[in-house]
């Protein structure tokens, strides 16, 4: 039996689970009921289940093959976002202010589908397949924390995962080698001026004016400090300052992010930002401090793993389903796994205007064409089987 023969059989199964999870979202590090539901379903398949009882969120399932061998992990993230859903379909979120707006509901459903297929084909598995249902991806720290649970990560030899992607037409899959998603870091800028009366600005140092100048000058970091051949995104997402209409605020705080693909350039990017922040503030008689927090490194696919994934997609779904897609600037904590183990991270197309699947990730109208998810389940299952067979 081959997974391609099970795609139609499990199509509704995978769709139903995606819609169940969509209706019952839980935020990062709060995925308690999600974890219980996953554990119960996996146990019903005869999968060995290890729940992170210390945290109460996240679990590892293990499928032992008919023959001994190495171990590979298939990963799905399980957390939702603090977004108020504006969709109106019958499986929209039942929880105010919480929504699966990034597609992790689809990831869980895909991996459950893969588990169904793998348990039906144990005779083809030459080793162990670990099913990693990881919490808190949206925090950036979910993977590093989860890797420590039960030493599971030390027991595997390779890993595979993916992300449903709204920019890719439904049914297509991209598994190219090299950088696929950007490194993500958080920046906080603290501005200190001098508070004063709104009618006497000459006796104050206006933190709002200083912060505004910093935002404008930071645009030159990308346009004048970085090669046009490199990719850098620098975004300021919030500014907080003042509380009264007639008071010049003496302090301001800004938060933002930078995204890039070249780790060797990170120090240069940070120092360029720091120089602009500090010297712009000095020009206005103020001071400013940059706080830099690394979140995730770039997600970089191993060449051999990607080559195998391409063969698996073609063999399982047909050559017409293998797509090429440019790397993207959002970050993904799957990158932490790829820092230590060979693996591949796939993009799974879910865009379909006929079902309203056109809104971007993190949008309150986000949805997907979930009719294609069982095909992704087949790719996950066949990748695990193929990798174990080629690495006896």
Put a short name on every predicted segment.
Residues 59, 81-83, 87-99, 105-106, ...:
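Histidine/acidic-residue-rich, glycine-tolerant segments that coordinate divalent metal ions
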